[in-house]
C-alpha cells in the first residue's frame, strides 16, 4: 500500500481529540509481524508497534545480552487526532476527496499525511542487518498531551524500549516539501502578573493609586521585550502579553489592581529563573504578585547529528531541496522524546492549511515524503 491509499483511509476516521475511533485496529492490521503495546488514560489511546529485523541467532543471544549490544532502534512518531473541522468545507472533512492533484480532508497535513507516509515506508522497509523499527502514535497531541506520547514514552522506559532516534512527522515545510527540518523547539513559560493599587473615585485621582498608571510606566520593559539575543537556530526569547484585565466595568471607579497574562517563548539562553529575576528587577518597589509556570522546555538536536545528516541527505536526493534547520513554531511531542535523551527531529509536509477549512496535501508530497522516509530507514540500517 502506498502513502496515498493509507492516508485516505486514515482521514476517513473522525478522530477529533482524544477520540481514536478504531483507527489503531486498521493500523495494526497493516503490521501483523510487529509486536504491539497499548496504553492510555482519560479517554486517550496510544499505540506502539515494533519489530526487530534480523535478530541474533539463538546461540548468540546470550552473548548479545551479556555485551548489552542492542541494534539501532529508530522510531517514527505522530498523532492520529485532529482538531474539529468547523463549517463551510466544500466536502465532508472526513470523506477524503482527490481534486486537481490534492487530497482534501481534515488531518491531510496535520498530520495524517505524514503518518501515512511513514506507515507506507515502514511496510516497504526490508533491512539486511539487525535493526529495531518502531511506530508510536497517540490520540492526544492536539489536546493537553498529558496522557499521550509523554505517557507512552514513560511506559517504554520501564520496558527498556526507548528508541535511540525518532522522526516526528509534523508538517514542518513552508513552501516546498523539503525546505524545513525542525531540529528543536522553543520552550514556553506562562505568567500572571498582578499590579496592585488603591481603588477610588475617578474624580479624585489623588486619593487613588491607579495600577494602570503603574503599568504604563513599566510596559515598555515587559511587552514584546527580547529576553536574550537568540542564536543560529533560536530566535530571541520574547515576552508577549496575551491578556489584560482591570476594573469593575464602571466608568467612575479606578481599579484596585490590573492583571497581566503573558507568555514567553524562549531559547536555551532563558529559563524560568532568569525570567523571574528580570521581572522582579523591573518591578522593584512596585506592589505586585508574580506567578510563572513552565509548560515546556526548549531543546535542540545537534545539526551534525547522524539523524539530521541522514535526513538532510535524503531530502536533497529526493526533493532536490536543501532544508533549513530551525526551531520555529509552537511546541510539539518531539519535546517528550528529547526529555529522555532521544535524538529527535521533525519533518513532514507543507503546513499552509493546517487547522484550516479545506485542509489538503498534494499527492506529489505524499509520494516524495514516503521516499524520503524509506531512504532514511535504509541509510540508517546500513551505516
From Swiss-Prot:
Lineage top rank: taxon: Bacteria
Protein name: Succinyl-diaminopimelate desuccinylase
Binding annotation for Zn(2+) 2: 110, 142, 355
Enzyme class label: hydrolase
Gene Ontology MF terms: acetylornithine deacetylase activity; metal ion binding; succinyl-diaminopimelate desuccinylase activity
Alphabetical list of InterPro entries matching this protein: ArgE/DapE_CS, Bact_exopeptidase_dim_dom, DapE_proteobac, Peptidase_M20, Peptidase_M20_dimer, Peptidase_M20A
Positions that bind Zn(2+) 1: 79, 110, 170
Species this protein is from: Helicobacter pylori (strain HPAG1)
Pathway assigned to this chain's UniProt record: Amino-acid biosynthesis; L-lysine biosynthesis via DAP pathway; LL-2,6-diaminopimelate from (S)-tetrahydrodipicolinate (succinylase route): step 3/3
